[in-house]
Amino acid sequence: MASYFDEHDCEPTNPEEQYRQNALLELARSLMQGLDIDSGSFDLSDWDQRLPPPAAKAVVQSLPVVIISPEQADKGVKCPVCLLEFEEQESVREMPCKHLFHTGCILPWLNKTNSCPLCRLELPTDNADYEEFKKDKERRRQREHRLEDLHGAMYT
């Protein structure tokens, strides 16, 4: 039995493209119905709906290379990506969060996303829009925290 995509001679859309298509459809529906449009909901650079960009190339290249010590090798420390034990005197990459990875495991990961596979600590990116989004998100979080503190101080 042929798949839906084969029968209709089309390809599945990626999540980013699907988000854009949905936003455009919603815009068209609103225009057809003569409704007020909230322009904020049609921001096509909405990073809450998209995958983060790759880590900055300069940051990835500057990740420290660490040599596995005999103690670490004896403990059976493993690469969290491939699950192979590190060997004594093996060169591995250390993330800012201190997690260790084989170079061949972590570099492809960081070419797709900007975070540690274990703890999700984010590295800087080369995408100015995403960096601005992160700053704005942090400002909103701080503002909410200050508001909670103020509210708590009023009622204690």
Curated annotation (Swiss-Prot):
It catalyses: S-ubiquitinyl-[E2 ubiquitin-conjugating enzyme]-L-cysteine + [acceptor protein]-L-lysine = [E2 ubiquitin-conjugating enzyme]-L-cysteine + N(6)-ubiquitinyl-[acceptor protein]-L-lysine. PROSITE patterns: ZF_RING_2 (PS50089). It holds the Pfam family zf-RING_2. Its EC number is 2.3.2.27. Pathway: Protein modification; protein ubiquitination. It is an enzyme of class 2 (transferase). Signal peptide: none annotated. A zinc finger (RING-type) spans 79-120. SUPFAM superfamilies: RING/U-box (SSF57850). Keywords: Metal-binding, Transferase, Ubl conjugation pathway, Zinc, Zinc-finger. CDD domains: RING-H2_RNF181. InterPro entries: Znf_RING, Znf_RING/FYVE/PHD. Residues 135-156 are annotated as: Disordered. It comes from the Eukaryota. One of its GO terms (molecular function) is ubiquitin protein ligase activity. One of its GO terms (cellular component) is cytoplasm. One of its GO terms (biological process) is protein ubiquitination. E3 ubiquitin-protein ligase which accepts ubiquitin from an E2 ubiquitin-conjugating enzyme in the form of a thioester and then directly transfers the ubiquitin to targeted substrates. Catalyzes monoubiquitination of 26S proteasome subunit PSMC2/RPT1. Belongs to the RNF181 family. This is E3 ubiquitin-protein ligase RNF181.
